[in-house]
């Protein structure tokens, strides 16, 4: 699963 950091 892709992980996004904002």
Curated annotation (Swiss-Prot):
Domain of life: Eukaryota
Post-translational modification (record): Glycosylated.
The keyword Glycoprotein appears for this protein: yes
Tissue spec: Chorionic epithelium (trophectoderm) and placental cotyledons.
Keywords: Glycoprotein
Note: On the 2D-gel the determined pI of this protein is: 5.6, its MW is: 76 kDa.
Protein name: Unknown placental glycoprotein 76K
Protein's organism: Bison bonasus (European bison)
